[in-house]
Amino acid sequence: MIRVELPYHLRNLAQVDREVSLVVDGPVTQRAVLDALETTYPMLRGTIRDHTTQIRRPFLRFFACSQDLSHESPDAPLPAAVVAGEEPFSIV
């Protein structure tokens, strides 16, 4: 299970708590996590990434293991602690 922390406005929109748990099939990347998040919570589609380009919205940042991953490739593997569920993938 991958843990994802959401900011207040996205929590309100999805009607969830601060942290959600997701099952991600295949390699755990930003793209895979966001795809799983948008599949589980369709009301979040287009709020984190642009509908057409799938590029991160400029007002959001991605963090994991105290690292800013916002400018990393969306297909780069996430840190092992995130994959193991020890640390959350944070959307700020």
Describe the predicted segments one by one.
Residues 1-92:
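Ubiquitin-like/PB1-type beta-grasp interaction modules and other compact soluble beta-rich domains
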